[in-house]
Swiss-Prot record:
Post-translational note: Predicted to be exported by the Tat system. The position of the signal peptide cleavage has not been experimentally proven.
Record bears the keyword Transferase: no
Designated name of the protein: Trimethylamine-N-oxide reductase 1
Gene from which the chain derives: torA
Binding annotation for Mo-bis(molybdopterin guanine dinucleotide): 191
Amino acid sequence: MNNNDLFQASRRRFLAQLGGLTVAGMLGPSLLTSRRATAAQAATEAVISKEGILTGSHWGAIRATVKDGRFVAAKPFELDKYPSKMIAGLPDHVHNAARIRYPMVRVDWLRKRHLSDTSQRGDNRFVRVSWDEALDMFYEELERVQKTHGPSALLTASGWQSTGMFHNASGMLAKAIALHGNSVGTGGDYSTGAAQVILPRVVGSMEVYEQQTSWPLVLQNSKTIVLWGSDLLKNQQANWWCPDHDVYEYYAQLKAKVAAGEIEVISIDPVVTSTHEYLGREHVKHIAVNPQTDVPLQLALAHTLYSENLYDKNFLANYCVGFEQFLPYLLGEKDGQPKDAAWAEKLTGIDAETIRGLARQMAANRTQIIAGWCVQRMQHGEQWAWMIVVLAAMLGQIGLPGGGFGFGWHYNGAGTPGRKGVILSGFSGSTSIPPVHDNSDYKGYSSTIPIARFIDAILEPGKVINWNGKSVKLPPLKMCIFAGTNPFHRHQQINRIIEGWRKLETVIAIDNQWTSTCRFADIVLPATTQFERNDLDQYGNHSNRGIIAMKQVVPPQFEARNDFDIFRELCRRFNREEAFTEGLDEMGWLKRIWQEGVQQGKGRGVHLPAFDDFWNNKEYVEFDHPQMFVRHQAFREDPDLEPLGTPSGLIEIYSKTIADMNYDDCQGHPMWFEKIERSHGGPGSQTYPLHLQSVHPDFRLHSQLCESETLRQQYTVAGKEPVFINPQDASARGIRNGDVVRVFNARGQVLAGAVVSDRYAPGVARIHEGAWHDPDKGGEPGALCKYGNPNVLTIDIGTSQLAQATSAHTTLVEIEKCNGTVEQVTAFNGPVEMVAQCEYVPASQVKL
């Protein structure tokens, strides 16, 4: 999956010679009643209370309270019965010291442009410039790079951005740059990089982002639910579109059934997750597997199913291919080592009889396997995802209600019955207008690379790597543009990122917060938050419950501009403004998107009101007729008429396609591969004995809302990001709850606040991803992160030659108590604004 596709998406160079610079200072300081529309199967037009401005977000729909021009409070939307605690931090997203207020340019880049001293990136010294000046420089750099280097030197990237169908940073970035010239594209993503590549080879579809079997059917039919590295309760707080949180009602029903003994839940995880805790420790069977040994456990389960004749031979014969090729490996005929429970016990820390008992229980009745994403974010993560499918196939329940497997249960309200409604379009990143620089000569380099390997491209241009059956020659990147993303949060091994950044000529960041990505950029452009503009959004993701108006809460703050206006002005500089806007402004686009929805609805028998009526009076419409769904049911009922998208049309336990790639780290069937580093007696554990998890956070969405002081007050320890550690590990190191500690390995070091908890198995620690990077020595590689970003510690290697995805969870660390003075966190302030003490020199007089 192309990352840019997934997340779509008067020359006045004024200052060339700066004389003396002085520091100017730090920048900073009621239930819904509904009426049925008259048309058949119409949307419900909700009568909304006017107490607060209605808008949406990744964390849910809210009513915003504004006082004296400031967004001061967020209350849950009336229909959200299970609102996220994170909405309390939304006002801070608009008003905080880390807000980007003005266009800024890094000091030395302003002096020398692409010939600047790149080792100064990260020193946080910037000069404020006008919008015209900033956009002129942006345009001039695009021109220079296209003319000097060509498309192989330019990479753009986006990420989670903000909600809204129109104000889509990824799509706007993609379209604007495509109108100027070609660039390097990216494939894959950081969330599901391994699974989304292997699963289409095995079951013919990506699986990870797709709808799951409806929860009512699971609750009715399942007897055993296996949560394998999946924390439903924590992760459903935030979704891609505005969440309705209806899925939490099914979690409440699950809790009741578990308490009544009607369903047994098994959690395979080295941690007692939030979901585990919610369902009750006394009711959940906990399999605290040693980190990164899930595949040995899976193989041992498969071995038990086979050796005890508990597997479904008919399902394997009629719906699968390749079990016969997999079996010799499972039985040890290839390497002399049967992958039985006794073998797995030594690796997993789970005694052999418990493993055998788990296999028997899964085979005894209807079992739903709920797989998360964190386990595949490790070296060889493809193998775990593949083995989930193999286990489900051996059980023979794929396509039955309450049985089989799923990889997306923790995301986008999966399992909530979807409603028959409209899915709005949005602002597309594609365009049929030819670019100004219509140059498709990548000079022998690849035009698309795996996103998790883009730092490799910067550091090792020309290196040839394998990727999903293709050979990729990494391009010599010179310029990167980021909008709606924070690579210093999502990419691994930050000190390696910093080394790569020094080789780039120009970095441009478009954002609303001074993240580390912005601090390490050359040109920083202030974008509005979603609360400073108008938009539309789906309400509910897989549920498709309705459509919500996203009303502007406050005006754009300081000099922030909408991404649409930023890129419109950029495109004007190369005569593509009309091609970018298509002649429409913000409200014009919203009306077009709405009208396209009206036409779509006619084909589905769904009526939408006129836009003006919706926008001015209704603000929300709700769809009817939730539909029950069973994942893979059509395939099970008729595999000939409903084949999977694999070469055989069946589940491929053995893949000839993968085998023919001849990769030593991902072969024709799932296997156990030792990791480059692994805790509990594995490689590297003598020096760094603790496994570090860096899973999704509980109080933010990735790095979004880390700027919220309101939320940080609820979870930080001594002003630091918490590190969770088992009592035994803490005691052995003289660490107590609340201590500031240093977490370190050969790749880096961070400070964090200790939280001692028995929810974490011995040898396991956790720092949530998304913590802002706060180096004590600016842009110097190896600097101590004063706040606690775990990606300072993670390793930047691909999962395998197949997916080339992130291996964040292949990370070992040591932890020690800090003694003496601890440096204060400065990540949540703005930059040091520099003021020139010289005359500006026209660009025409400067030799660059």
